[in-house]
Amino acid sequence: YENGKKQKYAMFSFGFPNYLETEEGFAAYNEYKCGLLSPKILKTYAGRVLANDLSLKNSFCAVYNSLLEYFPKNDAWTLTLRAKRGLSDTSKPGAFTKDHIYLKGFLNVKKYAERGGDIKKLYIGKIGIEHVPLLKYII
């Protein structure tokens, strides 16, 4: 937001369509580059994706029991709770699916960097990787 406010156009602070995946992934990528993205955090990101997927098809109890195969009780509970948050009846299938963007975004930003993408351009504001080619026409 702050970097976006420094740009000529407000859209850089309000956000381009679908910017959030890149923004969250870029934050995780920066943690990774600084050596702060531990295997435990990555496992949590993956667990959130799994919990989201399971929640779309199952009840709270079924999701929790499935996650116990991969996570300790407290972690399985927290992952299930996050995936089912906001639902009025957690016994039914459904999920708050925003949490999948952290892992997906991280992997996309990492791939972008590994393929020679200009990481510095992602600091410009709330943009997605797919918007980087458009910057030459805007800035």
Regions found by a protein language model. Name each.
Residues P39-I139:
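Conserved alpha-helical "signature site"
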Residues E2-A51, G105:
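Post-HExxH zinc-binding segment in Zn-dependent metallohydrolases
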